[in-house]
């Protein structure tokens, strides 16, 4: 099978300048009979050296495309002008990316068995190649994201206005999505929202593949203190629930006898100081050269995600590397784990201190939960299995 992959971002083993890791891990363990050639606008700015390394890792060729003038102008805008123009456009900026005539002709001349398009906004490119069988990966539904964000009480008036404007753009995009493609998302609610907006399209939810992990790591909580980690950037995806969580930990400083805490990511300085001043042993790491290696130095990951869609890659990272994950519903959605069996889930931050006391009092039981979580994710989110499901969509009836 010969498949042409088209994306705004170049694929990479980690998320670089966007969600570049998902397509990488869907390709890295593909079947030997699936040949892929990549065409990308490289909006995430991978260097020539990095692109060459990815080509070798994925056993394929990457073609970097020039942007059409309109898209280059839109994506090059900065500051107030960028905000103003984006607000006035009927569609999100990446929608205006197009293949030039020579590239369209070249792809058609290759006579591929299918075209795989990555990025919800690239429906215009889908129309350029409408006669070729297509699979279009979201990977999430932006309308669902903005709808969930607007439910949050901490969203201010200006941000709320911007969210409503962007939600209308993405709703228009989804409503006009071409029926020449089959659509692929990594969230069940994302699929349902896409179908609610446009019942005419074929949308499929497939499990998100896990990323790289340390298969040799043994699950045994550290002595004398269990090592907690909160990983990721302190942004609107986590900030509100993270503040509530840190307040609870600061108020239950007796837990510091059993735990030490690490913030792994940017923007956590105020919360790091809050815990330290409360009496916790807290460490702040803003950058790790090898993220998986640093993650493996810990035992339990706290994931207080306030809002989001799809599948959270950092949660999969933690579980496959043998950490016990304690997270909100948004952190755990679309992952094949269940509370009390392969993970721990909470609704309100005030529940977390009791969970941590249970872990400290019964380490072995919770190590077993972490082990069960790793086994479930390695089985249900297996990269070979995910790749087979994705490329198998080209063989489905109607393509």
Language-model regions, residue ranges each:
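Acceptor-binding helix/loop patch of EC 2.4 sugar-transfer enzymes
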Residues: 72-91, 136-171
